[in-house]
Amino acid sequence: MEPVTKWSPKQVVDWTRGLDDCLQQYVHKFEREKINGEQLLQISHQDLEELGVTRIGHQELVLEAVDLLCALNYGLETDNMKNLVLKLRASSHNLQNYISSRRKSPAYDGNTSRKAPNEFLTSVVELIGAAKALLAWLDRAPFTGITDFSVTKNKIIQLCLDLTTTVQKDCFVAEMEDKVLTVVKVLNGICDKTIRSTTDPVMSQCACLEEVHLPNIKPGEGLGMYIKSTYDGLHVITGTTENSPADRSQKIHAGDEVIQVNQQTVVGWQLKNLVKKLRENPTGVVLLLKKRPTGSFNFTPAPLKNLRWKPPLVQTSPPPATTQSPESTMDTSLKKEKSAILDLYIPPPPAVPYSPRDENGSFVYGGSSKCKQPLPGPKGSESPNSFLDQESRRRRFTIADSDQLPGYSVETNILPTKMREKTPSYGKPRPLSMPADGNWMGIVDPFARPRGHGRKGEDALCRYFSNERIPPIIEESSSPPYRFSRPTTERHLVRGADYIRGSRCYINSDLHSSATIPFQEEGTKKKSGSSATKSSSTEPSLLVSWFTRLKLLTH
């Protein structure tokens, strides 16, 4: 970029044509006086008065735009966060020292005068200018994404507002100075803390200029940039539209400042004049951008994509069986080299209701797959429903493993069970005083070890028969409602937990590979066809024996 001090009078006139509309009436006066770039950077209120710019407001607009050119010309290679903080600290110290030295003077009239001296107001203006230069850095990437710098920025803004409000109040100068000293001391503390606590190299890195070419712009396509202009004429890019020319260039990032458009400096211009300059050449645009350092704040200045919601594409066919793993998704995102703002991927819902699957992708309740060995731990999600798959595998292993159920070998080869016809006594436990009927009781091993309450195996078995893990129940055809009896079949029935929590019913014994069942205190041996023992069917119940003993005692 050519220094502003080397500008010709024509370049100065071209620059003034992009300023505010109210200043266009003075363009011919700049052209008539043939003011070059070096004279422009040194222009003052008196020079503008001689040019014919008599209105104070118009003079301030010109001088603010010239200040931006001075910062671009003289401060590009020297301005960084550390220097800006030091400048703000120096300005606050100067103001504090001025007030202290003035109060030591014998001619001090702060307690009686309501008019602040010009030197005091000038020091306040310099302090606010230094704060504005620092805020211009803190208000952009990468500092906007850091909490500490955001808090510092908000504090400085509030202190500057308090400072400007204080000097405009109608009060004694001494009271005004007291409030200003309070603000200055807080600013000094913020600057000292920022310098001491921040050790990142980005504090000492300066900005740089980069030229970006956007060729082959299609008619009606646009550049795809979002630009925010400050009140004094800085143009900052806040984002780019996805797949736009600006996005495809991979060189335009959020926080970049537009300095030139097609070799024309646009610093201090109105936004509408900048847009007009961007549309001047429909075939392509050459931009000169001022880029801030990124440092090691874990911030990558990638394009800020359009934040408007993009509706997903309508699926006309079922989704494919294979889903993309997070590892492959991560690799793809790295290849695209788009960071800073990540695209959220929301997986589509499955085409069919969810059923747990094993690692091979087959259903776990199909009746043909067995899990005889513990499954390995999850190696990563393989589908949007991977958490449910892993949870299902974990629960199967915890409950169905024979090592976890000592004395009760349980297989996971579960066959669908048929639902019996509901009777008036359905779900009610058998009274303990009733005799054990061999027609409906299962086989009990008299030498089996009794199970104590609270055992881990029993808890696991009860969980196994809860309504969350039993196989689908198939409705059986109607049968005569026998009380406590079933048609004689070759299958043995055992007592288990019903699918209704808290009740008991009799389910197929094929669910177990062992004849041992819980609740052994309620079971007896079944009558065998080849054995002559009939004690299990003829033995009186406990209640009958109690009545017999009672009669003996009464006699």
Swiss-Prot record:
Residues 325-546 form the DUF1170 domain. The keyword Secreted does not apply. Its main location: cytoplasm. It holds the Pfam family CNK2_3_dom. Keywords: Cell membrane, Cytoplasm, Membrane, Phosphoprotein. This is Connector enhancer of kinase suppressor of ras 3. The PDZ domain is required for interaction with ENaC and SGK1, but not for interaction with NEDDL4 and RAF1. Induction: Up-regulated by aldosterone (at protein level).
